[in-house]
């Protein structure tokens, strides 16, 4: 923000980006006008991350911490396509939503350092992630900023029912369930997502 000479901003974030946005909101509240999230992980999910029926969905979070994981996935274009393609198909409501763009995703992940950089995130937050699952994380102050959340109904990794505790962590959050989307609401329903973002930031106090 300083580098871009932006004194105050609105933030749009999804999944991993939501962790960053929540930290910014708690540490630099005066510089954030509002928060807009798609499928937002937050501490209130707690032990549900590791429920018996959900363990099969989070295996990759441990796999990414293996020192050879990026090398294995990036060992061949076909391997990378199979790996990344699995998540795009499985997490989207329409498994064909990314068919036209899959090769672009593979191109990006095969650039030097991109797989390892992404996988390193999981190593860097491993202790904090386990603390949340064990419900031993330090209390997180409630975010007192205008917040809007669109959550895909059919997301298998961040379940729509996990919106239940959002009001404990955000003041009066506006929560909308996107009935025809999975994990990638902004990609699966781009027109609706773009309109919601614009409408939200048009009315937050700047």
Describe every region a protein language model picked out.
Residues 181-190, 194:
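Catalytic histidine-centered segment of alpha/beta-hydrolase-like enzymes
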